[in-house]
Amino acid sequence: MEPADLSNLRGRSLRASIRGSMRGSIRENSNSIWRNNGAEVFSRSARDEDDEEALKWAALEKLPTYDRLRKGILFGSQGAAAEVDVDDSGVLERKNLLERLVKVADEDNEKFLLKLKNRIDRVGIDFPSIEVRFEHLNIDADAYVGSRALPTFTNFISNFVEGLLDSIHILPSKKRQVTILKDVSGIVKPCRMTLLLGPPGSGKTTLLLALAGKLDSALKVTGKVTYNGHELHEFVPQRTAAYISQHDLHIGEMTVRETLEFSARCQGVGSRYEMLAELSRREKAANIKPDADIDMFMKAASTEGQEAKVVTDYILKILGLDICADTMVGDQMIRGISGGQKKRVTTGEMIVGPSKALFMDEISTGLDSSTTYSIVNSLKQSVRIMKGTALISLLQPAPETYNLFDDIILLSDGYIVYEGPREEVLEFFESMGFKCPERKGAADFLQEVTSKKDQQQYWIRRDEPYRFITSKEFAEAYQSFHVGRKVSDELKTTFDKSKSHPAALTTQKYGIGKRQLLKVCTERELLLMQRNSFVYLFKFFQLLIIALMTMTIFFRTKMPRDSAEDGGIYSGALFFVVIMIMFNGLSELPMTLYKLPVFYKQRDFLFYPSWAYAIPSWILKIPVTFAEVGMWVFLTYYVMGFDPNVGRFFKQFLLLLLVNQMASALFRFIAAVGRTMGVASTFGAFALLLQFALGGFILARNDVKDWWIWGYWTSPLMYSVNAILVNEFDGQKWKHIVAGGTEPLGAAVVRARGFFPDAYWYWIGVGALAGFIVMFNIAYSVALAYLNPFDKPQATISDESENNESESSPQITSTQEGDSASENKKKGMVLPFDPHSITFDEVVYSVDMPPEMRESGTSDNRLVLLKSVSGAFRPGVLTALMGVSGAGKTTLMDVLAGRKTGGYIDGSIKISGYPKKQDTFARISGYCEQNDIHSPYVTVFESLVYSAWLRLPQDVNEEKRMMFVEEVMDLVELTPLRSALVGLPGVNGLSTEQRKRLTIAVELVANPSIIFMDEPTSGLDARAAAIVMRAVRNTVDTGRTVVCTIHQPSIDIFEAFDELFLMKRGGQEIYVGPLGRQSCHLIKYFESIPGVSKIVEGYNPATWMLEVTASSQEMALGVDFTDLYKKSDLYRRNKALIDELSVPRPGTSDLHFDSEFSQPFWTQCMACLWKQHWSYWRNPAYTAVRLIFTTFIALIFGTMFWDIGTKVSRNQDLVNAMGSMYAAVLFLGVQNSSSVQPVVSVERTVFYREKAAGMYSAIPYAFAQVLIEIPYIFVQATVYGLIVYSMIGFEWTVAKFFWDFFFMFFTFLYFTFFGMMTVAVTPNQNVASIVAGFFYTVWNLFSGFIVPRPRIPIWWRWYYWGCPIAWTLYGLVASQFGDLQDPLTDQNQTVEQFLRSNFGFKHDFLGVVAAVIVAFAVVFAFTFALGIKAFNFQRR
C-alpha cells in the first residue's frame, strides 16, 4: 500500500469512528467526521498569517452564524487567500485542498489527527465513545443432520411437508439444535484495537453480527449486548455501528467514487453541522483563529451537497483508491477493479458514514500484507486518537499487523478461549502447557493451538503425557486466569449510563430527510439507466424488429372487414399487440433481481427506506415506456389497417402505455417477492398464466367456470384486451351489419369473444390499469421493505460430525483424528506413477497489443508478458512461484500447463527431456485452479470417484481405483468429509479451506506426475492454510513434482517450500534456487547485493524478500535484479541443471498414449451421466420446483378448462380447447427453457475445467446433459398429461392419449434442449435469456393460434413451418379433433372440415408432424453438443 493509502485509511477510520459516536445524540457526532476529515487539514496550520488574511478572518467573524459556516478562506496556488462560498467550491478547489491536507499519508496522518483532536480539545468539546459489552451470549441454530442435510429431491419434499406440519404443531421438526456461540461474555473497549481470531466455523461472523445488531431473526439468542449500558432496542444499532461484511456486494455499473459518494450522501452529515457551529462559537468567544484549510474542509464536510464529495475524496485518498476512483467497480459481466480494491471499497462504503463502532469481518482477503498493515495502522491511529471502537477479524495477520492490536479475542468451537491484552495471550497458553515456537507467528499459533490435529506439536511439558485440551477446557481455564478474572470483575460493574456521551448513540433511523433520500435514490437510478442504456436500446431494437414482422403479417391489404372471421383476425392482431407490449415489461424482472442483493445490504444498513428505492424505479421508466410504445404504435397502427380515426390512434397509444407500465410494475413486484431467478421466474410464469388464460381471449368469459370467474375480473389483461377491442371495433368501419346479423359487425365480434362492446369499457380499462399500476408499485415497495433474501448459509452437520465424540465443531476437519496421512508418505501409493521433471528455457509469452495501448502511441504489435524465463521443476521438490502483482506468476504457470487459450509462446518446454506435447502432457499433469470450481450437488467422495473414473488408465480396476481414492482422501485429510455436499461457495456445503483441499484431491486422484497449484492458500486463515500446505507437502513427499504460486505466506508456510522461483513485474525471474534452512540461501543471496537492507531477526523472509526487491528499491539502488541474477553463479548452475534435465535419460521414451482420453467414449458417457444423475437428484430447486410448478399448472388448466373436451358443438368451443393447448405449450415450454439455463450455465464452468484436464471430450458431456433430462421430463409430461387429459375431458382412447402425451413430452423436451442450446452458443446466461426471449416472441406470433396458417401472408408462411410451437399445436389439435365428423351448430361444417379450412390441420398428416417434433428435439440437442464442443467463452 502506498503511503497515501495509509494516511487515507487512517483518516477514514477516524472519521467513521467519530461520526458513529456523535451521531447518537444531537450533533456532536458530526464532530467526529470533521475531525477525521479535518485532520489532514490541521497539518497545515503552521502557516504564518499575513495582514490580508487577518482582515478576511475578521470579516468572516462578523457574519451571522449560518453565513459564517458557509464561507471559508481558501489559498490559491500562489498562496493568496480568498474568501470562498463553500457551496460554490468545485472539483479543482477540493482537489487542491486535499493535496495540501494529505501530502504523505504514512508520515502526516497521525500528526493530522492529533492536530484535529487538539483543535476540538482546545475549546473543551468532548469526543463521544462507545463501550460494547456482551454478557452470557448464546446463539443457536436449527440444522438437519447427516443424509437429511443433503438437498435431494426426496429430502426437499420431506422437509417441506415436515415444516408445514411443524408450523401447525402436528409433527415436531427433525432438525437438530446447533449452538454457535456458547455463553460468551466480554468487553470491546474504546481507544483500543481488538483482533478477533478463530478457525472457520468458530462463530466469528456470528459474534460480529450479534454485536452490530444484525443477526438473522431465525437464530435463537439469549444473553444481552449493550452499548454504553444501553440495550440494542434503546437506539439504532445499524447506524451507531458499522458492520463491514466479508462479501463484496456492489453495483458493478457504478464507479468507485460514485459508490462511496452515494453511501456518504445516504448516511448524511450527522451532527457535523451542529458540532461545527458550537466549535465556531467557542473559538470566536476565545478569540482562537483556526487553520484555514482545516476550517474550509470542516465546513465543506458539514454542508449538504458538498459533504459527500469532500468526504469521499478524502476516503478515496486514504484507502489508496484514488487511482481507480473513476473506474467501474465491475462484476461478472463488466470488467472493473481488482479483488483487493473491491475489498477496500466495501470498507470505504461504511467508513464514509458516521459510525463510531466498527465491526469488520475479514477485511484483508485479497490484500497483500503491506496494504493490510497500512489499513490497520490507519484504523489504529483513528481509534486511539478519536476514541473509536473497533473489533476486526483477519484471516492471516502478519506478525507486524498482529502487533498493531491492543486486545485479542480468540474463539474456538463457539467458546471464548481468551479475551484480553495481546501481550498476555501467550502467557495464558504457556500456563496451559503450550508454547509458541520462535519462528511462528503468534496469530498462526493461536489459531492452531485449539485444533485437534495441530495442538500436540506445541506441548512443552515433557514430564507429563500429552492429551488433547478441548476448547471448553481452555475456556474454563481462562475464567480462572488473572486476565479472565479481571474481565469478569469489570462485567460485574454496570456501565454508568449517565457517563455516556449524548452523541454516542444514534436514535434517528435515517441519516437524511425524506426528500433528500428520494433525490439521492432518483439520481442513482438515473445514472444506472444511463449506464445500462445498451439494454434499453437493445429492447427498443428488438421491439422494432417484432413490430416490423407484426405489421407485415397483419398487412392492411390482407385485412378486410367483411365477416366475423375477419374480425377474428383483427382480434388476434390486437391481442398480440397487447401481449407484446406486456411481455416487453418482462425485462424488469431480471434487472430488478440483479440489483436486489445490493438493495438488501443497503436497506439493512438503513441507507434508505424501500419506498425511496421503489419510486424512482417506477417513475424514471415512464419516458422509456413512451419511447417504446410510441415507436410501436406510430409504426404499426396504420400499416396494420386499424381504424384511421386519429382519436382512436392516440387512445390506443395511451392504453398501451398503461399496459406496459402495469406489466413493468407487476414484474418488479414478482422479482421482489421471488428474490431469486428460479422462484421469481416460476411466480412470474404463474402470474402471467393466470392473466393469459383468464384474459378473456383464450377462454371466453361465458365459458369461464364459476370457481375461476374471480380470476377473470382481476386479470389486468382482460381490461387491456377489452379496452383495445372496443377502441377498434367501435369505429366507423365496423358499424355495418353483415347478412344474417342483428347488430353492427364490430359489436358482434367483441361480443362473440365474451367481451363488452360498449364504448365506456375503454375508460373502464384505462381506470383499471391505472389502479393496477398503483397497486403493484405499492406492493413492490412493501415486498422490498419486509422480505429478506433467500440464499443464506445453511447449517448442516455431517454423519461423521454427529458421531464424533469430540468437543470440537462438527464442520471442521480438525475435529477428526488422523495422522495416517503423514504415515502414508513414506509407504508410497497404491498406484505407481512415473516421476517427471519439467524444464523450460528462454520462454517468451506475448499477446496482441491492446487497442488502448496502441492509441496511446505504442508502436509494437505485441505486448510481452514473459521475457526469456528459464527454470526446472523436479520430482520430490516443492517449488514456490512468487512475485508482486503483475509479475506473471499465473501467466507462467498457465503457459507451462498449456492452459492459455490465446497469445504466442516461444522457447523450449520439455518433459523429462522430451519436447512437451499438450495432448499427452494433460494425462500426466494436474492443475489446481484458484477458483475451486466444482459441481455443487455431488459429495466430496463422489467428486473424487468421478475424477478417478475418467482420468486413471483403463487397466486400473474398480477395486484399485476405490482404494486409491480412499488413500488420496486420507492424504489431504478429507476422509471425515466424504459424505459432505460440495455446495455453492458462500451459500452451503464446504468451507473455503475444505474446497481448496478438494481441488487438490480431485487432481491427485488422476495420479499425476506434475501438479500446478494456483494460490492454494489465498482466502484462508492461518490454520486452514497450514492444513492445505500439509496436504501439499504430503503430495510432494510421494515423489511428485509440485509448483505453487503463493501470495504473502507466513514464515512456516514459506519455509515448507524447498525452492523458490521469484519474479518481478514485467515477467522476469530474479531468483531461482533453494531456500535453505530458515531461508538461509535466499537471505544470503540478497544480502550479498550492495545496498540491500539486512533482514531483522524473526522477520518473515517472504515479506522481506518482496520489500527489498520492489521496483522502488531497484530505482533507489540503481540496479536491475534480473541482470544481477543472470550474471550470478546461481544462474549458471540453474542453466547447467536445465541442460542436464533437457536430455532424455537412457532407457526412457517419450510420453505416448494409444488414445486421447484415458477412458473410451462409452465409459466417458456413463461417468458423465452418473455425475449428472446426482447433480439433478440433489437439485430440488430445479427438478422439484419444475415438477411442482407443472402439477399446479395442470390443476389450474384442468379446473379452468373443465370438461371442454366433450363440448365441440360451436366454433368458440374449439377455440377454447385450442387455447388451453396453446397456453400450456407456451408457458410450460418457456418455463422449462428458462429454468434449465442457470443449471447448464453453472455446470459449463465446471466443464471448462474438466475438459482442460483431459477428462473427456465434449460429446459425452453433452450426451449426459441431454440424456439426464429425459426421465425428469417423462415424469413431468406424465403428471401433466394424466391430470389435464382427464379433467379437460378429452376422448379416452389409447391412440388419442398416446398422441397427447407424445406431443407434450417432445414439446417439453425440445424447449428444454432449446434453453440448453442458447447457453452453449452464448457467453453467459444473461445473453442466453435475451436470445431465447426473442425466439419465444416470434414463435408465439407464428404459432397458428393468433393468426391461423391460411391467413398468414404468403411471404411469411414459410416461417410457420419453421416454428416448433406451430407443429406442436398442429399435432395436439389434429390428434384430438382432426377426425371428428360432428357438425358445428354455428358453422355449416363438421369439426374436421372447419379445422382443415380455417387452420389447415389434417388428421392424416400426424405422422409427419410427429417426425418433425422429434427432429426439433434432436436438432436442438445436437446444436447444444456442437456449441459446447466448438465454443469456449473462457478467456485465459
UniProtKB/Swiss-Prot annotation:
Q: Which organism is it from?
A: Nicotiana plumbaginifolia
Give the top-rank taxon of the lineage listed in the UniProt record for this protein. Eukaryota
The lineage, from the top, is: Eukaryota, Viridiplantae, Streptophyta, Embryophyta, Tracheophyta
Q: Where in the cell is it found?
A: Cell membrane
Membrane topology, record value: Multi-pass membrane protein
The protein, known as = Pleiotropic drug resistance protein 1
The portions of this protein that span the membrane are 534-554, 567-587, 622-642, 653-673, 679-699, 707-727, 764-784, 1184-1204, 1214-1234, 1270-1290, 1301-1321, 1327-1347, 1358-1378, 1408-1428
By sequence similarity, the record places it as follows: Belongs to the ABC transporter superfamily. ABCG family. PDR (TC 3.A.1.205) subfamily.
**Keyword entries, A-Z:** ATP-binding, Cell membrane, Membrane, Nucleotide-binding, Plant defense, Repeat, Transmembrane, Transmembrane helix, Transport
Q: Which residues form the ABC transmembrane type-2 domain?
A: 516-729, 1163-1377
Region of interest (Disordered), ranges: 796-826
Q: Which GO terms describe its molecular function?
A: ABC-type transporter activity; ATP binding; ATP hydrolysis activity
UniProt GO BP: defense response
- Which annotated residues bind ATP 2? 883-890
Q: PROSITE patterns of this UniProt entry?
A: ABC_TRANSPORTER_2
* InterPro entries reported for this sequence: AAA+_ATPase, ABC2_TM, ABC_trans_N, ABC_transporter-like_ATP-bd, ABCG_dom, ABCG_PDR_1, ABCG_PDR_2, P-loop_NTPase
Q: Which residues form the ABC transporter domain?
A: 165-438, 838-1090
Where does the UniProt entry say this protein principally localizes?
membrane
Q: What inducers act on this gene?
A: By terpenes such as sclareolide and sclareol, and by some phytohormones such as jasmonic acid (JA) and ethylene. Strongly induced by compatible pathogens such as the fungus B.cinerea, and the bacteria P.syringae pv tabaci, as well as by non pathogenic bacteria such as P.fluorescens, and P.marginalis pv marginalis. Weak induction by incompatible pathogens such as P.syringae pv syringae (at protein level).
What this chain does, per the entry, is described as: Excretes secondary metabolites such as terpenes. Involved in both constitutive and jasmonic acid-dependent induced defense. Confers some resistance to sclareol and B.cinerea.
Q: Where is the composition biased (Polar residues)?
A: 810-821
Give binding positions for ATP 1: 198-205
Tissues expressed in:
Roots, petals and leaf epidermis, where it is confined to glandular trichomes (at protein level).
Its GO CC terms are: plasma membrane
